[in-house]
Amino acid sequence: MSEIRLYVTTTEAKAEEILDLLSALFGEEDFAIGTTEIDEKKDIWEASIYMMAEDEAEVQSRVEDALKASFPDARLEREVIPEIDWVVKSLEGLKPVRAGRFLVHGSHDRDKIRPGDIAIEIDAGQAFGTGHHGTTAGCLEVIDSVVRSRPVRNALDLGTGSGVLAIAVRKLRNIPVLATDIDPIATKVAAENVRRNGIASGIVTRTAPGFHSTAFSEHGPFDLIIANILARPLIRMAPKLATHLAPGGSVILSGILAGQRWKVIAAYSGARLRHVKTIWRNGWVTIHLDRP
């Protein structure tokens, strides 16, 4: 199901006021709200709220009523967020991506690998994750840091997409990794990429909606859980995800817009996890938490 963005284009000051209005209107609900700078010199900003298509009619009605009362000149616009369109670009348009010690590249760029690179070969295809998106690159940076500095005996990549993050963990350390996704096409693509990278024996791929699979109890609890999904489902699954984390374990979360980070951190703090750090990439954040 598509994700929808409703937004108003305005000045920075007005965008902040509209953000406050939306926060008051939807404060107890799981809709992502944020502001984005479009043009610094011209003072053009956007105030946005994100929702799934099934919620659009109700959210749009409430936003329009609120804007009409407080910002009668504001014009509400709509955008359908592409789910995988960017992934299917021609291979020629995808340059190698460096994140930490990792080099994520397509088969056409094997000559770009340098000595010391941890190379992951992922061609553009049907599943999310070639390293070019800020969320994937951010996760790779934090994975590199966590796996080098903490004891990690097993890992879970929840919402694996192309499998790039599971492959990264396995290439860093010879530990078992469970890679799951709700989409069977993604699971198939991930399994193919695991084989392409020569580590098929170390990664188990499974199609599983949320945590509704015996695979989690069979392979967990986990020292490292990575979930590069979206803020709303991440918030919802916080209590359940925390039950699958081993004592002293780490969680890496992404798919989160900068303005959503505090809600996500609050949800996981409520699940007794501690915020370690947040890194920023192109308007997206990756959050590292652990269990003390």
Curated annotation (Swiss-Prot):
Q: Where in the cell is it found?
A: Cytoplasm
Pfam families recorded for this chain? PrmA
The organism's lineage is: Bacteria, Pseudomonadati, Pseudomonadota, Alphaproteobacteria, Hyphomicrobiales
Q: Which residues bind S-adenosyl-L-methionine?
A: T136, G159, D181, N228
Give yes or no: UniProt keyword Ribonucleoprotein.
no
Q: Which NCBIfam families match?
A: PRK00517.2-1
Keyword S-adenosyl-L-methionine on this protein? yes
Name this polypeptide is given: Ribosomal protein L11 methyltransferase
Role summary: Methylates ribosomal protein L11.
Q: Output the superkingdom of the source species.
A: Bacteria
Q: Which CDD domains match?
A: AdoMet_MTases (cd02440)
* Single GO term (MF): protein-lysine N-methyltransferase activity
> GO CC terms for this protein?
cytoplasm
Q: Which family does this protein fall into? A: Belongs to the methyltransferase superfamily. PrmA family.
InterPro entries noted in UniProt: Ribosomal_L11_MeTrfase_PrmA (IPR050078), Ribosomal_PrmA_MeTrfase (IPR004498), SAM-dependent_MTases_sf (IPR029063)
Keywords for the protein's UniProt record, in alphabetical order = Cytoplasm, Methyltransferase, S-adenosyl-L-methionine, Transferase
Give the chief site where it resides: cytoplasm
| E.C. number | 2.1.1.-
Question: Reaction(s) catalyzed by this protein?
Answer: L-lysyl-[protein] + 3 S-adenosyl-L-methionine = N(6),N(6),N(6)-trimethyl-L-lysyl-[protein] + 3 S-adenosyl-L-homocysteine + 3 H(+)
For the biological process aspect of GO, one term held by this record is: methylation
